UniProtKB/Swiss-Prot annotation:
Group of enzyme by EC: hydrolase
GO cellular component entries: extracellular region
EC identifiers of the protein: 3.1.1.-
Native species: Dictyostelium discoideum
Record-given protein name: Phospholipase B-like protein E
Amino acid sequence: MKLFILLIVIVFLISNSYSLSSSDSSSDSGSDVQYYSLTSQFQVVQGKQIPGSIAWGYFKDEMNKDGWGKLSIETVSTVSDNIAFKAAGYLEGYLTWEYIYKFSGNYFNSFFNTSNIKEIPTETLTFVSDNWEYMMERVNSSSTTDPYWIQIRNAMSQQIGLYEGYNAAAGEDYQKTFIEIYMINLYGDMGDIVTLTTTPNNEFIPMDRKEVEQLMATTGHCTSIIKLTNNCSDLMSAHTSWADFSVMIRIYKRINIPVASTPYGSETLFSSYPGLLVSIDDFYQIRPSKLHLTETLNTILNQTLYQQINAQSFMYWVRNLVANRLANNGFQWVSIFVENNSGTNNIQFVVLDYKLFTPYSTELQSDLLWIVEQYPGGYQAADVTLTLWEQGYWPSYNRPYFEEVFDILGYPYYVEKFGDLFTYEYNPRANIFRRDHSKLETLQDMMNIIDYNQYKTDPFSMGYPGNSINARFDIKGGSLPSGNPIYSWFYHGTHGGIDGKAINYDMVNSFTAVARNGPTVTSDCPPFNWNDWSLISHQYMPQIYNFTWISINI
């Protein structure tokens, strides 16, 4: 009954130090781009900005060419917010419906071992449905002029548009319910939702070394680094997403919705996935605010925290969109993001305000770099610009920075049992970044470090391919000669780094990036081949992932 009601409600409502050949770049120029426009009657027709259109864009299916689909969506500024955001979602769903369909089967299998919505646990479906209904109730009872609630409405309109656009383009055999489409957009939140709704109780249950290692390997999401060059000539960022390899159907997106309610965050360039309105890597460039966002996830090791998660909150995805669109600095972004905290996708968000950076400056302006770490029931945030200045870099690697968050999430228990592997200061990635950050002077250096995995020879990796910047848990690692069980490695599976992205100061101004899709390839790590994991869902994906870095210019 709830799903039926839900559907009724929906109706209501570069100058750089690296080189890339022309074949390794992505641009919207050239005859290979076919634009489509959306009319005010929500009909999709060929052509760019045809008379009477309210949105236009293109999608380039280049997954097998260089690893990435590329999507560009732009709306007019003269229609209502509801129409503009619904139009952006609709055109995205329409143009990328095949990718969404292909992605969805692997996505649902990775969480539920089935792609059949009828076989997904009822408790999970109920949570998702209740959450959407809760947001609808809050929106309908809230101010129509408050900027925060305007953007909540806009995000929901965009989600509805995505659903309607998908089904308008997909054939009869490929139709999806709203709940299915919404669950895809909940990718960042879904791990915690599934744990909450499928676990009998949420009491603290100590894990042995094998159990906690597998949990960290399969939920630890990403590595990132912000680097200030030694002469302060550049401020660079690089990030690798860690995930299940079955989600490696990727889209780089540029979304521009220049309505009056988004004076600081009308346009975003970000790495993403089919059917998602957010990045969830996360790796954003936003203008005109010139904010850059990236993050890594902090795994919940204290299961009692799940008692504080419920459907009556705003999930990560919607809080992310709202903060991106309203904030003009790091403090504002953090303040907006933590409102109505769901306690799902508990990440360390890193917010870099490029407006405040001047190359070759002798000091950094305060508020240049903010971080926030949320957890179920709370958060901590701070301006860490001084730390960036003193260290020369800001690393992030699935360990809470704030001591309070570290304690609440349950890390001290495992530090006491298993040592430095679980610490913020001395885990393998922390050690590698501390040793190597001073060598990072160019964009190419950032590309190299975020791809880094020399587990056979790097002492900090201790012989395990999961202990590096760009993990490869699909490659077996061995025990140390000492046989110490604390440093023996258990987990082996299709998880790890699935990409690389990087930007520098000039790229923020040109609204470009460089990116690579797929597990890292190094002298110690051969190209990933699905032949080695044929039983894992990987429909429609390239058989071998050996893509190089490309320039993103959408």
